[in-house]
Amino acid sequence: LGALASRDWRPLHHDREFAINRNGVKDIFINTPNNAAWFERYVTDWTGPKGRLGRMKFRMNQPVFPGDEMVFSGRVSRIDVDEAGCCWLDLDLAISVEGKVATSCQARVAIPRDAADNPWQRKNEHWKP
């Protein structure tokens, strides 16, 4: 469904016979926007509603198929406060299947630096991801 919702009509994401016979894989597999959505959800569930994703890049190393158990992991690699006073966390994230990293990701997320701060209120020169 993720492929269709993102208008990715490539049959390898929703036509099992095509994926197996034409691409030589065991089944359909999740597409790029679906991978991005999983990481974004993982980060924002962790940071809470005031966490604001600034940047994200990821690399898909192997496909994730229906029925695969995805295990998410992550660590904070850097904490920084920029010149505008925004608190940034650099994250190293991964989705693993059967103990192997299927997709690795680096993300930069803003979090409140104190109870009065809200990264969602930052604009223009105060928002520099």
Task: Give the residues covered by each predicted segment.
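Hot-dog-fold acyl-thioester-processing enzymes
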Residues: L1-L53, D114-P129
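Short structured motifs
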Residues: R55-N61
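HotDog/MaoC-like acyl-thioester-processing domains
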Residues: V64-P129
